[in-house]
């Protein structure tokens, strides 16, 4: 047992450095090509001329597509092993390391050029790759899947500063394939990754700064639970839209570079209306949480961002869909809150409260992982007073969503991009 805990610690350290490496590479490319040192792609887009704002995502998608197509032609074969940590966990615990690194580099290109796709997917993949490399060198074969799970959880903890949610995500996704006793090393890796990441970044701040002054009462619990029903209906709709957009891009029968470039062009066009469509949505989420906008502003940004996410994901842009889903949930919740706020004196607090809860419930509806979704929002915002209501709402959202749409967003996304 001591040996496993020691290896889990090493995996956590490796994962933290893998995530930090990708984050710093992203910041470097943003500084070189966008003259942006703020770390916010929305700020970068705001400061660009309209023609550069239009073309940059398209050129990034084109470059990523050429890289992926060139690698496939160079090797003259498809990857001989998984290039995704979810696939590796469901098979024999092995990666195609070279193809996975190329995929991560392609993700770096589309992320830094403004595509509305999550950077955290590549971060978690690199963390799992680092864990796999170490495991294949120093551990027996039957443990490889465990250490990949530890690496993925550690990567999620370092990326989102949510070690418990990262650990439980792995446990919920792999329920039935991992014994409960295996959860110990996963948690150790996640916590170590968070601590090392805090040391690297010289900060232990929460991912999102939220000032929620309301004390949750009976009325608020009823509203929170209602967001679970809303998310249970919206989650399957979002998954259906993503699947339809992917099929639409595939039906065009374009070469991968042109398909990714087309997705980038759509993002670029949308960014002419609002630069908030650039990136994974992190900075827009923070701005909404700091000062919830008016109803029409939320609606406008939401529609543009939703179309950008659908275009990026549908075109096959390598990256995650976790953080974009958080923004979509926040926007839906705030639209709901603004509508209800017309009848309540504390409309601002209700808007913020329902925005936070819809982030969790839509995440639960799309991932089918309600416990992870609850803890994720609590850990990212520090609003643990929401925990009881969120647990109920997330379970409701997950149950309704599973009834309407069998596959989770990860299973669907993996199938589309494998």
From Swiss-Prot:
GO molecular function, one term: voltage-gated chloride channel activity
Keyword tags: Cell inner membrane, Cell membrane, Chloride, Chloride channel, Ion channel, Ion transport, Membrane, Transmembrane, Transmembrane helix, Transport, Voltage-gated channel
GO cellular component, one term: chloride channel complex
SUPFAM superfamilies: Clc chloride channel
Transmembrane residue ranges: 5-25, 54-74, 146-166, 168-188, 222-242, 258-278, 291-311, 316-336, 352-372, 380-400
Localization in the cell: Cell inner membrane
Pfam families per record: Voltage_CLC
Cited function: Probably acts as an electrical shunt for an outwardly-directed proton pump that is linked to amino acid decarboxylation, as part of the extreme acid resistance (XAR) response.
Family membership noted in the UniProt record: Belongs to the chloride channel (TC 2.A.49) family. ClcB subfamily.
Name recorded for this polypeptide: Voltage-gated ClC-type chloride channel ClcB
Species this protein is from: Shigella boydii serotype 18 (strain CDC 3083-94 / BS512)
Chain's gene name: clcB
């Amino acid at each position: 047992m001591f040996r496993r805990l020691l290896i889990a610690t090493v995996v956590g350290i490796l994962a933290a450095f893998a995530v930090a490496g990708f984050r710093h590479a992203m910041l470097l490319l943003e500084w070189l090509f966008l003259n942006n040192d703020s770390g916010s792609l929305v700020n970068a887009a705001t400061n660009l001329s309209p023609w550069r704002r239009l073309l940059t995502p398209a050129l990034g998608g084109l470059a990523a597509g050429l890289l992926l197509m060139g690698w496939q032609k160079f090797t003259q074969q498809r990857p001989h092993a998984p290039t995704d940590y979810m696939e590796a966990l469901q098979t024999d615990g092995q990666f195609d390391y070279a193809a996975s690194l190329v995929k991560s580099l392609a993700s770096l290109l589309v992320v830094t050029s403004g595509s509305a796709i999550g950077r955290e997917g590549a971060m978690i993949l690199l963390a799992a790759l680092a864990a796999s490399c170490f495991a294949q060198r120093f551990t027996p074969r039957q443990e490889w899947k465990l250490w990949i799970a530890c690496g993925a959880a550690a990567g999620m903890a370092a990326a989102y500063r949510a070690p418990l949610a990262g650990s439980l995500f792995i446990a919920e996704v792999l329920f039935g394939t991992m014994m409960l006793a295996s959860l110990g090393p996963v948690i150790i890796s996640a916590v170590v990754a968070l601590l090392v990441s805090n040391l690297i970044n010289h900060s232990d701040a929460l991912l999102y700064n939220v000032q929620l002054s309301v004390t949750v009462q009976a009325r608020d619990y009823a509203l929170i639970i209602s967001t679970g029903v809303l998310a249970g209906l919206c989650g399957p709709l979002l998954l259906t839209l993503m699947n339809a957009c992917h099929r639409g891009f595939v039906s065009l029968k374009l070469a991968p570079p042109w398909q990714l470039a087309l997705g980038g062009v759509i993002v670029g066009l949308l960014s002419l209306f609002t630069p908030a469509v650039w990136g994974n949505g992190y900075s827009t989420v923070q701005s909404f949480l700091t000062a919830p906008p008016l109803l029409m502003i939320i609606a406008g940004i939401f529609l543009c961002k939703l179309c950008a996410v659908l275009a990026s994901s549908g075109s096959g842009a390598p990256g995650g869909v976790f953080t974009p889903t958080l923004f979509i949930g926040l926007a839906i919740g705030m639209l709901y809150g603004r509508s209800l706020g017309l009848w309540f004196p504390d409309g601002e607090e209700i808007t913020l409260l329902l925005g936070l809860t819809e982030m969790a419930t839509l995440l639960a509806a799309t991932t089918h992982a309600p416990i992870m979704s609850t803890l994720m929002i609590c850990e990212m915002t520090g609003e643990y007073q929401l925990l009881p209501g969120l647990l109920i709402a997330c379970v409701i959202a997950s149950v309704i969503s599973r009834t309407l749409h069998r596959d989770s967003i990860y299973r669907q996304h993996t199938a589309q991009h494998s």
